């Protein structure tokens, strides 16, 4: 995330915290992130040099006024005006990260070869909470390439204990060992 985009997310979250609107701002930015992802034409229009600032602001008002918190809409307009709107997905991720830090939430992406049972999910969640002292929020993914085991990703850290990793290590060992 660029320094400018980080500055925007820090400022918006700080303001939202002052007025007690953290949950609303988080919810709105997450919904907008989905909208921008699902409608790439919107980003194309907002980054176009052929469309005036005023027209972009009018478009944002028409699409989002009354549907998102006024601070979020103002930030969108500012990012458009400053030519930083391409950083909007990173901005939204920054808001989510600040919220998680503020509320003591550990966001963990869990990748397994097949879906975990409810019991496995609950055990993993409870164990992560015991270790971290934070509330664990799990995002579950399946990747058959794992073969077995789990890969956990959180706060820029990746912990992999998958059968695929073990097989890869064994392969390297065999290749580097001379007979």
Label each PLM-derived region with a short phrase.
Residues 1-179:
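Elongated, mostly alpha-helical coiled-coil "stalk/stator" tethers of large membrane protein machines
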């Amino acid at each position: 995330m660029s320094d400018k985009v980080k500055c925007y997310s820090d400022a918006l979250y700080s303001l939202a915290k002052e007025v007690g609107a953290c949950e609303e701002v988080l919810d709105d930015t997450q919904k907008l992130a989905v909208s921008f992802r699902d409608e790439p034409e919107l980003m194309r229009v907002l980054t176009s040099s052929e469309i005036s600032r005023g027209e972009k602001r009018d478009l944002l008002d028409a699409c989002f006024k009354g549907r998102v918190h006024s601070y979020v809409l103002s930030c969108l307009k500012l990012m458009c005006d400053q030519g930083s709107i391409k950083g909007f997905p990173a901005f939204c991720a920054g808001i989510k990260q600040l919220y998680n830090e503020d509320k003591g939430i550990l966001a963990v992406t869990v990748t397994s070869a097949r879906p975990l049972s409810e019991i496995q999910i609950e055990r993993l969640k409870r164990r992560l909470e015991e270790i971290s002292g934070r509330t664990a929020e799990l995002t579950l993914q399946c990747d058959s390439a794992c073969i077995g085991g789990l890969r956990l990703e959180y706060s820029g850290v990746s912990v992999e204990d998958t059968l695929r990793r073990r097989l890869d290590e064994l392969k390297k060992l065999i290749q580097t060992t001379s007979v």
